[in-house]
Each structure stands twice: as structure tokens, then as C-alpha cells.
UniProtKB/Swiss-Prot annotation:
Location, primary (coarse class): secreted
Ranges for domain SCP: 45-189
Localization, UniProt: Secreted
Disulfide links within the chain: C4-C17, C8-C101, C26-C94, C170-C187
Annotated signal peptide: none
SUPFAM superfamilies (UniProt xref): PR-1-like
GO cellular component: extracellular region
Top-rank lineage group of the source organism: Eukaryota
Taxonomic placement: Eukaryota, Metazoa, Ecdysozoa, Arthropoda, Hexapoda
PROSITE patterns membership: CRISP_1, CRISP_2
UniProt similarity note: Belongs to the CRISP family. Venom allergen 5-like subfamily.
Cited InterPro entries: Allrgn_V5/Tpx1_CS, CAP_dom, CAP_sf, CRISP-related, V5_allergen-like
Identification of the protein by name: Venom allergen 5
Keyword Methyltransferase annotated: no
């Protein structure tokens, strides 16, 4: 397993080394489905790129204060099967939160996670979970540096629109826990965004 040889920026044992099986490992949670369909992957990618272009064109009016300034170096993301594989391995653990070591040979990797639950027997569409990350833009103050914003409130948004990020790959699992129907989405991004001394994108 080559992932066992990767030295991550943040240290730790690589997720794809620690968990080699692609089967869910969810203890007392009842797994209903895991993995994303081809259509869901396309929808997630399109949602990311539509939002990045909305920001780039200066059409995002939300913020603290809004609007967000337009960008001059915002490119579309492409889907990475490798990033998606590592994201799926992590999602399969049913542990909400970030794993420690998910980098790949060519670059460090960032991550967004989202979890929704319903007592009705239905699961949110993955695009709805991606939109939860976009909604954090309402708390972003573009008049301040990235590092001066409250990272806990805006970190998913900033990773989504980080201009130097080129690829995304996601994994998903749906399970039942104490009568709650939960959908857990993990997206990995490379190269990673959210470096404290940098900015999200170059403004026009």
C-alpha cells in the first residue's frame, strides 16, 4: 500500500493506509448505502464550479459585509478519482470530522465535511450538503484578510473557492443511527486551500 509511505504535512498515518478495506466500518450504525453515482459526482462537481464562477464574476451578494469581490484567477475544478477514493475510505468510517492524513504524492489535500439527518426515511441530495458550505459566505468579511476571519465559521466556503485548488473528489455514506437517517459527505481538495498566510483568490 503506497499510501503508507506518504508523509503528510500534518503528520499521522494515512487514511488509505490505516483503513485498507472499502467496506463501511460503522459499529452500531446501520449502513443504508455508500459511494456516489456517476450522476452525483457530476452534480457535485458542477455545483462547485457554478459557485466558483459566481464568485469570480462578482455575483455573490452575501457576506459580512457583502458583496464578495470578483476574482481574476478562479479556474474550474476537475474531478479526481484518487481524491474521491481517499474521501470515500474516510466517509466509510462514519466518524464525523476531519481525518488527519489524506495528502497524495503530488500535493497536500484539504477537506470539507457535512452531515445532515432526518427522522423521516429520506436522505438529502449531496448537492444540498455542498450548498451548506457555500452558505458560510454570509459570515465572510472580504475587507479583512483570510487569516483575520473566524475560520470555524468560513473554512468550508474558503476551501470551495480557493483559487489555487485544482481538483476535488468526494465520498458519501448514508446510515441510520437512533432513528435518524444521516447522510455524511466528505470532499477532498488538491492542492489544499486555507493556508493562513495566503488569500482565497486574486481580486479584480
Amino acid at each position: 500500500n503506497n499510501y503508507c509511505k506518504i508523509k503528510c504535512l500534518k503528520g499521522g498515518v494515512h487514511t488509505a493506509c490505516k483503513y485498507e478495506s472499502l467496506k463501511p466500518n460503522c459499529a452500531n450504525k446501520k449502513v443504508v448505502a455508500y459511494g456516489l453515482t456517476k450522476q452525483e459526482k457530476q452534480d457535485i462537481l458542477k455545483e462547485h464550479n457554478d459557485f466558483r464562477q459566481k464568485i469570480a464574476r462578482g455575483l455573490e451578494t452575501r457576506g459580512n459585509p457583502g458583496p464578495q469581490p470578483p476574482a481574476k484567477n478562479m479556474k474550474n475544478l476537475v474531478w479526481s478519482d484518487e481524491l474521491a477514493y481517499i474521501a470515500q475510505v474516510w466517509a466509510n468510517q462514519c466518524q464525523y470530522g476531519h481525518d488527519t492524513c489524506r495528502d497524495v504524492a503530488k500535493y497536500p489535500v484539504g477537506q470539507n465535511v457535512a452531515l445532515t439527518g432526518s427522522t423521516a426515511a429520506k436522505y438529502d441530495n449531496p448537492v444540498k450538503l455542498v450548498k451548506m458550505w457555500e452558505d458560510e459566505v454570509k459570515d465572510y468579511n472580504p475587507k479583512k484578510k483570510f487569516s483575520e476571519n473566524n475560520f470555524l465559521k468560513i473554512g468550508h466556503y474558503t476551501q470551495m473557492v480557493w483559487a489555487n485548488t485544482k481538483e476535488v473528489g468526494c465520498g458519501s455514506i448514508k446510515y441510520i443511527q437512533d432513528k435518524w437517517h444521516k447522510h455524511y459527505l466528505v470532499c477532498n481538495y488538491g492542492p489544499s486551500g486555507n493556508f493562513g498566510n495566503e488569500e482565497l483568490y486574486q481580486t479584480k
